[in-house]
């Protein structure tokens, strides 16, 4: 500290004024770039976020009557025929239905040998469509690992049990 004071006193009055002016400019620049500018940038981001959130809130308020209206509507009352659902999902999962025979509220099916994973995915899709598996018996196909022959498959609608 003593060395800095000695250096300061060795300078002429003009050099001291220039050094003080440079220190003030440096201090102003430092305050501007470390405090003021980041604050302004954050404030602009906050304003944008606030505007976006207010727009979202306004949109949500506009959608409230529509949501209430849709909530009060009843779902369509014409469910698909079970055979239509079964055939559509079988085609989607790559299975071939050989025979589909109604037995009261149940359906007996004959399916060509198929990949076990595809069969399970198909039965899961039918379950999501409201069909349950009443009876299922399969045997492995000896020449094709992962393939099964469906010996017995009886399906029924979940709401008709």
UniProtKB/Swiss-Prot annotation:
Where it sits in the cell: the answer is: Cell inner membrane
Q: Name any one Pfam family assigned in the record.
A: T2SSM
Protein keywords: Cell inner membrane, Cell membrane, Membrane, Protein transport, Transmembrane, Transmembrane helix, Transport
GO BP: protein secretion by the type II secretion system
Which cellular components does GO assign to this protein?
plasma membrane; type II protein secretion system complex
Q: What is its main location?
A: membrane
Domain of life assignment:
Bacteria
Transmembrane ranges, per UniProt, are 17-36
Give me the Periplasmic side stretches, as residue ranges.
37-161
Keyword Nucleotide-binding on this protein?
no
Positions in the Cytoplasmic compartment: 1-16
Q: How does it sit in the membrane?
A: Single-pass membrane protein
Among InterPro entries, the record links this protein to:
T2SS_GspM (IPR007690), T2SS_M_periplasmic_sf (IPR023229)
What protein family does this chain belong to? Belongs to the GSP M family.
Question: What subunit structure does UniProt give?
Answer: Type II secretion system is composed of four main components: the outer membrane complex, the inner membrane complex, the cytoplasmic secretion ATPase and the periplasm-spanning pseudopilus. Forms homodimers. Interacts with PulL/GspL. Interacts with PulE/GspE and PulF/GspF.
**What role is this protein assigned?**
Inner membrane component of the type II secretion system required for the energy-dependent secretion of extracellular factors such as proteases and toxins from the periplasm. Plays a role in the complex assembly and recruits PulL resulting in a stable complex in the inner membrane. Provides thus a link between the energy-providing PulE protein in the cytoplasm and the rest of the T2SS machinery.
Q: What is this protein called?
A: Type II secretion system protein M
Organism, scientific name: Klebsiella pneumoniae
């Amino acid at each position: 500290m003593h060395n800095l004071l000695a250096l300061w006193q060795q300078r002429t009055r003009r050099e001291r004024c220039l050094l003080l002016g440079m220190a003030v400019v440096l201090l102003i620049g430092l305050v501007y770039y470390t405090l003021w500018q980041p604050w302004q940038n954050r404030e602009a981001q906050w304003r944008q976020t606030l505007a976006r959130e207010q727009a979202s809130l306004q949109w949500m308020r506009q959608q409230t009557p529509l949501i209430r209206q849709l909530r009060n509507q009843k779902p369509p009352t014409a469910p698909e025929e079970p055979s239509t659902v079964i055939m559509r999902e079988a085609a989607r999962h790559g299975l071939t239905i050989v025979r589909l025979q109604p037995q009261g509220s149940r359906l007996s099916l004959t399916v060509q040998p198929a990949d076990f994973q595809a069969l399970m995915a198909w039965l899961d899709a039918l379950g999501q469509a409201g069909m349950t598996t009443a009876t299922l018996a399969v045997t492995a196909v000896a020449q094709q690992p992962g393939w099964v022959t469906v010996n017995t498959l009886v399906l029924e609608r979940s709401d008709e049990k």
